[in-house]
A protein has these predicted regions:
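Short loop/turn segments at strand-loop or loop-helix junctions that form parts
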Residues: 100-106, 178-180, 220
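Conserved SGNH/GDSL esterase-like catalytic core that processes O-acyl groups on lipids
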Residues: 38-45, 49-147
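A short helix->loop->beta-strand "cap" motif at the edges of active sites that frequently abuts
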Residues: 157-173
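N-terminal secretory targeting modules
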Residues: 1-55, 62-68, 94, 271-275
Length: 275
C-alpha cells in the first residue's frame, strides 16, 4: 500500500511537471501541446537587429511560436540598402510563410530625409517633400526614407508569383513594423530625438496603407522608455547587456525581444486566421 501511494505521488508530480512544460497527458498516451505557429517559416529582415549578430531574436521566436525563424537582416545597412536589388533578390529567393520587416535602425529620420507621397499628410505639414514612386524595373535610386520603404513593399508584393512557387502555392504574408526608438552618442543627436522616431513611424504607416501591407506598430505598442536605457556608442558591444529592454540603446536585449515577439506572434496569428 505504501509503495502504491508513493507511486501515485510520483505520477501526480510528473503530470504537474508535464503540464507546466506544455505537455498534455492523455489516457494511454503522451502528447505535447502544439505551439501556435508550428510548421511555419518566418523570415526576419532589416538590419543588424534581425541578423545573426543577435541570435536570441530567432531563438525566442522559435521557442514561443514553434516556427522556424530565419535571420536575414543586413548589419549596418540603411533602408536604401534593404530596397536594393541585391538585398531584395536575396529575400525573394527565401522560402517563407511570413516576412517580418524591422527597417530603419540606421536611418536617423531627421527633417528633410523622410518624404511623403501625400501632400495632405502630417509629414507634408511638417515640411517633408512630396516625392514620387521609384522605378521598380531599375535598382533602387530614391533619396528619401519613404521611397525606400515603398520600393521594398511594391517590389515584394510584385513578386507574389515567384514567392508562391517557392512556398508550395501559398502567398507569404508581409508584416512591416514601425521602427523602434533608439538613442546614440547624446540626447541631442538626430538618432535620439523622438520627433525623428515619429517621422519614420508616420512614413512606414503611410506606405503600409498605400500598399495594403499589414502594419505592426511596435513603436507604440512596446512603449519602451528610453530615459531608462543606455546611450549607444561605437563600436557595437554585442556581449554586455547594459539596459532594461536594450543592450546598448539601439539593439533590443532578450527582454526587449520577448516583448517584441509577443506582438509579432499575435500579429501572425491574426493574419493566419480564416478571414
Amino acid at each position: 500500500m505504501k509503495n502504491r501511494k508513493t507511486r501515485r505521488r510520483i505520477l501526480v508530480a510528473a503530470a504537474a511537471a508535464a503540464v507546466a512544460a506544455g505537455v498534455i497527458l492523455l489516457p494511454g498516451q503522451l502528447m505535447r501541446k502544439p505551439l501556435p505557429l508550428e510548421g511555419v517559416t518566418v523570415l526576419l529582415t532589416g538590419d543588424s537587429r534581425s541578423s545573426d549578430d543577435y541570435t536570441f531574436y530567432r531563438e525566442t521566436l522559435e521557442k514561443k511560436a514553434g516556427c522556424r525563424a530565419v535571420t536575414a537582416g543586413a548589419s549596418g545597412k540603411t533602408a536604401a540598402y534593404n530596397a536594393s536589388d541585391e538585398y531584395m533578390s536575396f529575400i525573394l529567393n527565401q522560402q517563407h510563410d511570413f516576412s517580418i520587416w524591422l527597417v530603419g535602425g540606421n536611418d536617423d529620420g531627421s527633417p528633410g530625409t523622410v518624404g511623403t507621397f501625400d501632400a495632405g499628410s502630417v509629414l507634408a505639414a511638417q515640411g517633408e517633400a512630396v516625392v514620387n514612386e521609384t522605378d521598380l524595373s531599375a535598382d533602387y535610386n530614391g533619396t528619401t526614407f519613404i521611397q525606400a520603404i515603398d520600393h521594398i513593399m511594391r517590389k515584394y508584393l510584385g513578386e507574389n508569383e515567384r514567392l508562391r512557387n517557392l512556398n508550395g502555392g501559398k502567398t507569404p504574408v508581409m508584416i512591416f513594423c514601425t521602427d523602434l526608438p533608439q538613442q546614440r552618442n547624446s540626447a541631442d543627436s538626430a538618432w535620439s530625438r523622438p520627433e525623428n522616431w515619429e517621422r519614420k513611424r508616420l512614413a512606414i504607416q503611410e506606405c503600409c496603407e498605400k500598399n495594403g501591407v499589414s502594419c505592426l506598430d511596435l513603436y507604440s505598442l512596446c512603449g519602451f522608455n528610453m530615459a531608462d536605457e543606455p546611450m549607444f556608442t561605437e563600436p557595437t558591444d554585442m556581449i554586455h547587456d547594459r539596459g532594461i529592454y536594450y543592450m546598448d540603446g539601439l539593439h533590443p536585449n532578450s527582454r526587449g525581444i520577448d516583448v517584441i515577439t509577443d506582438y509579432e506572434i499575435q500579429k501572425m496569428l491574426e493574419e493566419n486566421s480564416p478571414k
